[in-house]
């Protein structure tokens, strides 16, 4: 339910098995529960509609030939009986351009895909009406430069271990989306954003 949380990832096919395996293991180690407890990573989603968005995404994945490699359930046992607690979920194997790659779900559901060429990954990343946050991990500085030049998102990161697409520092980074993720293209906290709170007045004498 965090606006900048990663909802899709594109992995180079040469490291697909290793990366997806590590991601699956890490995801299965995340604790779901009461968010007031310090060791809990993930709490409930906000309402029944969000829960239904999650279950709909799981069903659509399976219907369209994808695979849910971890998660996929809404917990209702014991302490999970009060509220809606979807498990952190990863889906793979969906057709390129699938709607689950392009929609904003705001639930713990990640779509993972693979690519051969950098340009392909960039095109798929941009193939959505939204444009809030994006990130890249690469040892090739030319790729990083191309990512920053061509990605159509407002808040972008490269090789950031603290969060691939999330965790802007207030007062240090502007924060705002492009396209359907924003209205002006000007980020909160940036020098241009202040102008949104000012009015212009033309004054003429004589």
Give the ranges of each region predicted by the language model.
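Conserved NAD(P)+-binding/catalytic subdomain of aldehyde/semialdehyde dehydrogenases
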Residues: 1-3, 8, 13, 70, ...
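Flexible, acidic loop-helix segments that line cofactor/substrate-binding pockets
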Residues: 1-8, 24-56, 73-85, 102-107, ...
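Short beta-strand and adjoining strand-loop segment in the mid-core
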Residues: 8-15, 90, 183
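Residue-level signal for inorganic ion chemistry
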Residues: 12, 23, 61, 108, ...
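Short secondary-structure boundary segments
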Residues: 13, 72-73, 159-162
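Conserved core segment of the aminotransferase class I/II
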Residues: 13-31, 195-202
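Conserved C-terminal structural/oligomerization subdomain of aldehyde/semialdehyde dehydrogenase
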Residues: 31, 43, 58, 81-206
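Helical element adjacent to the flavin cofactor pocket in flavoenzyme catalytic cores
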Residues: 57-65
């Amino acid at each position: 339910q965090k606006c900048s949380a990663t909802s899709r990832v594109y992995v180079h096919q040469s490291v697909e098995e290793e990366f997806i395996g590590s991601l699956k293991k890490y995801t299965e180690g995340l604790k779901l529960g009461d968010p007031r407890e310090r060791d809990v990573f993930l709490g409930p989603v906000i309402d029944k509609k969000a829960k239904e968005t999650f279950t709909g995404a799981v069903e659509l994945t399976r219907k369209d030939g994808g695979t849910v490699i971890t998660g996929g359930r809404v917990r209702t046992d014991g302490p999970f009986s009060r509220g809606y607690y979807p498990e952190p979920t990863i889906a793979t194997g969906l057709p390129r351009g699938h709607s689950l790659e392009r929609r904003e779900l705001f639930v713990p559901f990640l779509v993972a895909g693979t690519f051969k060429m950098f340009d392909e990954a960039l095109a798929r990343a941009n193939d959505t009406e939204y444009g809030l946050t994006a990130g890249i991990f690469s040892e090739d500085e030319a790729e990083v430069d191309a990512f920053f030049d061509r990605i159509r998102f407002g808040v972008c990161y490269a090789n950031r271990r603290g969060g691939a697409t999330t965790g802007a520092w207030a007062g240090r980074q502007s924060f705002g989306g492009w396209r359907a993720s924003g209205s002006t293209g000007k980020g909160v906290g940036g020098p241009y954003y202040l102008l949104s709170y000012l009015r212009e007045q033309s004054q003429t004498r004589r």
